[in-house]
């Protein structure tokens, strides 16, 4: 591959210092590259647009950390261009390359010495609404405002699964299994898997456990009332970005998205090897 876009976290590559070095390096080797900015906020006036990405782009290099890569992946998901993360942060499961090895990585990419992994994404929408959004890690239904738990009915493919009294419900992809889902007690699974993880967050029940569902399943979450006023409100967060509110009686539908995120890999390291290395740093 010869045609690249470099998306940089504006707070981790200030003044585009590393981005400019990468663009110059690629051009020196006969390729093309364009630098774009990504902000910490998922919605920002300064965030890049799809129109900014040239049609001949073969790879997107994302400078920052897992969060930056996730934001970029969901923003460009319709293009299905492979991404490679360059870790400028701390703990990065998605970012295989570090700043010290980025130019060696570019050499490998330009010599076509790489593989790609397909990662499933989720798509969610409120029942009755035509507005939907995708997530690479997770979609979370969680309480808003007062410190009170939610009452949630969960259905899978139209069949009632369970009622949860909890702070919320985390619906995660295999990629997201090492994120918020793990913190709430969910299982860690191979990120290449085709499954959906359902994990109650702080459930008011001694027996509530995570459930691993098929990637083909459709999950529907209904907001119930626990108060006479029927004034409970819940929020929907996609990969940590809160974008919508749900009221009593609303139903929210989550399923596997049509498109995948393609991650460039340079080494055939097993998921367990990566897990040992990353988790070992924080044990």
Swiss-Prot record:
Its main location: cytoplasm. The active site is at 66 (proton acceptor). The keyword NAD applies. It comes from Agathobacter rectalis (strain ATCC 33656 / DSM 3377 / JCM 17463 / KCTC 5835 / VPI 0990). Gene3D superfamilies: Probable inorganic polyphosphate/atp-NAD kinase, domain 1, Probable inorganic polyphosphate/atp-NAD kinase, domain 2. This is NAD kinase. It catalyses: NAD(+) + ATP = ADP + NADP(+) + H(+). The gene is nadK. GO terms for cellular component: cytoplasm. One of its GO terms (biological process) is NADP biosynthetic process. The keyword Acyltransferase does not apply.
